[in-house]
């Protein structure tokens, strides 16, 4: 069943799932007054969850850009909705169980809050904001089969050299996990490099920092802008996942993505419950050192502090074995 999203104030949130009947009823209702909707046969235009999410997130980003950077780069208010539509509707075609439009949306929202805090703490331009948000939107698009030039029905581009890999029969997009960072960088270069306001190389450099295992040791004060952007994107990726209020109940989806590439055996996960059991240790050992700069920026605003609270709440629940949702333990 697809997820249902709602907008409350200036936030976009997941509010559970819609049934097929609810989705059908929603698709049959007009959206707004006086809107022109194309018809397919006797029915109204089909409305999809990726489409609705892209529209809502794009509008939110455009409004925020206009409000915070009104004196510069007005064209960015049109660019970000375009980028949201392009990336989210592509990711909406993915069959990966965890790395879906909701994950990308959450990473983008926490990335927004990180940059808002950064803008209050130090000089941040409209270009800084827009290119960082586009890196959030595109950081996992490499999971999707068919989005990179050179992809074929049975062979997919694996790296920047153009090398291709064939996936086992029955594979989902999750099987491209070992290659998704390079594929995401290729997508950005192929699709966005010609857009005047976009620095595709800058976005690709930031996406490289999401490659796991991490090779860059974070510094408390990152003076180099490229390094700081990369570290903040890495943090947004981690906080968007681990600070998700519904993270625990997504452990099953994450487990079976890991299973597809043999990562569970490497990590020692026998069941989805192991992801929850080992989450506190993973957080304090592997995650906390990577996100301190982002935490500093998030702590500047109330919405940023909510992400910190969500993150620590999930750690607390796993440590105290609060079994309110998620895999049976």
Where are these regions (language model features)?
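Non-catalytic interface/linker regions that flank or bridge core catalytic/transmembrane domains
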Residues: 5-20, 24, 30-82, 86-96, ...
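Divalent metal-dependent phosphate-bond-processing catalytic cores, especially two-metal-ion Mg2+/Mn2+ enzymes
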Residues: 34, 38-67, 113-128, 138, ...
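Active-site flanking loop/helix segments enriched in acidic
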Residues: 82-109, 166-174
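Short alpha-helical scaffolding segments that buttress acidic/His motifs in well-ordered protein cores
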Residues: 83-90, 132-136, 203-211, 232-236
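Alpha-helical phosphate/pyrophosphate-handling elements in metalloenzyme active cores
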Residues: 93-131
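An active-site-proximal "capping" alpha-helix that borders the catalytic cofactor pocket
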Residues: 107-108, 177-193
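Hydrophobic/aromatic-rich structural module bridging two neighboring secondary-structure elements via a short loop
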Residues: 126-137, 168-176
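Post-HEXXH active-site segment of zinc metalloproteases
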Residues: 147-170
């Amino acid at each position: 069943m697809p997820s249902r999203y709602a907008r409350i104030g200036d936030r976009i949130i997941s509010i559970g799932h819609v049934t097929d009947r609810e989705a059908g009823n929603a698709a049959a209702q007009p959206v707004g007054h006086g809107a022109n909707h194309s018809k397919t046969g006797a029915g109204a235009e089909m409305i999809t969850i990726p489409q609705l999410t892209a529209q809502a997130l794009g509008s939110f980003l455009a409004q925020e850009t206009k409000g915070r950077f009104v004196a510069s780069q007005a064209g960015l208010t049109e660019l970000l909705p375009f980028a949201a539509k392009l990336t989210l509707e592509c990711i909406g075609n993915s069959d990966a169980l965890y790395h879906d439009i909701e994950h990308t949306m959450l990473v983008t929202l926490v990335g927004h809050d990180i940059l808002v805090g950064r803008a209050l703490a130090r000089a941040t331009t409209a270009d800084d904001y827009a290119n960082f948000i586009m890196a959030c939107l595109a950081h996992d698009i490499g999971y999707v089969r068919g989005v990179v030039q050179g992809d074929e029905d049975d062979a997919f581009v694996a790296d920047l050299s153009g090398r291709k890999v064939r996936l086992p029969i029955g594979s989902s997009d999750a099987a491209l996990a070992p290659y998704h960072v390079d594929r995401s960088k290729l997508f950005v270069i192929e699709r966005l490099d010609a857009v005047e306001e976009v620095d595709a190389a800058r976005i690709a450099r930031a996406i490289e920092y999401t490659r796991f295992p991490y090779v860059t040791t974070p510094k408390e004060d990152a003076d180099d802008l490229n390094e700081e952007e990369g570290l903040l994107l890495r943090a947004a990726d981690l906080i968007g996942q681990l600070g998700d209020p519904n993270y625990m109940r997504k452990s099953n989806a994450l487990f079976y993505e890991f299973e597809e590439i043999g990562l569970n055996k490497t990590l020692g996960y026998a069941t989805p419950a192991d992801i929850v059991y080992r989450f506190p240790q993973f957080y304090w050992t592997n995650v906390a050192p990577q996100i301190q700069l982002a935490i500093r920026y998030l702590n500047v605003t109330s919405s940023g502090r909510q992400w910190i609270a969500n993150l620590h709440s999930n750690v607390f629940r796993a440590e105290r074995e609060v079994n309110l949702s998620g895999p049976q333990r």
